[in-house]
Amino acid sequence: IKVCVKKQSGQVILMLERIIEKTNRYIEEMPKKERKKYGQFFTSIETARYMAGLFVIPEQTTVTLLDAGAGSGILTCAMIERLDKIEDIKEIIVTCYENDENVLSLLQENLLYMQECSSKKIDIKIIIENYITSQYLDFNHMLGGNWNPEKYDMVIGNSPYMKISKDAPEATAMPAVCYGAPNMYFIFASMGLFNLKDDGEMVYIIPRSWTSGAYFKRFREYFLTEGKLEHIHLFVSRNKVFDKESVLQETIIIKVRKTSEKPETVTITSSKSNSDFGELTSLTVPYDLVVAGSDYYVYLVTDENEVEVLKKLHKFDKTLPAIGVKMKT
């Protein structure tokens, strides 16, 4: 990879390191309450590289990438860093959605810096619009929408974490996946899957709350019908995923392929935090054990013992209420 050098204390800093450094300065200077308006939390360098490494890169000379809610461009940079090493790729077409005016100038500066550093031809488009409402006609196949919207080979994202009202424009734009007062993260993930080409891959870091409960049923039904989980990464520590942020939400990384064909297995990996991806535990679990039932619950097993327990549970053909056992949690 071509190295963009910046001397600091005798060290050579690579492209992504420099962008992380600039992002950290932005975090220090921008009040958290301002970033909270957009549900904005930035991805760590280790997490960004791990996410970029999960993709199976298409064997093409030109690849297209979407990063919605791009922030300062950390995930885009991690992808370009990886794609730069692949000789057959000649051109990378990048689309970033970002409508936070506070971070836009930093994003533009970082994307231009990536262009200078990369050995590839990089075409960049920043769309300064609301990622959801600007596409609601397309998503819902409504009159006036684009019947042939642009689709991407790869979608990467760290979506906003922000609960919105059931009457918010983003919620009313996507009734197929929303129930009650939804969270922006799963609305973004749904649109990301919509923006993906058939058989394309999407890697997102999102809270794990969507994996169960009636509240998320519409989202799970859409997401796991239109796409299939291939890889889930779990963090054992809930407070070490976003280094400089106070995020106590349990977070996971998911890799999804846009296909109707169900894979035989799902890979489930786990690490203690975002800094020890080199020390992963890994399980290969039958898909029907992980994604099960008409409610599309996702069971996040972490070891072989849990897999065996789940196999036994799935053999039960009745629920506890069905046999007269009432429970409260």
Q: Where are each of the predicted segments found?
A:
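Conserved SAM-binding strand-loop segment of SAM-dependent methyltransferases
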Residues: K120-Y131
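Conserved Rossmann-like nucleotide-binding pocket used by diverse enzymes
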Residues: L66, T95, I127
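Conserved S-adenosyl-L-methionine
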Residues: R82-I93
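Short, conserved SAM-binding/catalytic segment
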Residues: L107-K121
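S-adenosyl-L-methionine
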Residues: V5, I13-P58
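Conserved class I S-adenosyl-L-methionine
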Residues: T62-G71
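Signature of N6-adenine DNA methyltransferases within the class I
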Residues: K36-K37, F41-Y50, A70-C77, I89-E91, ...
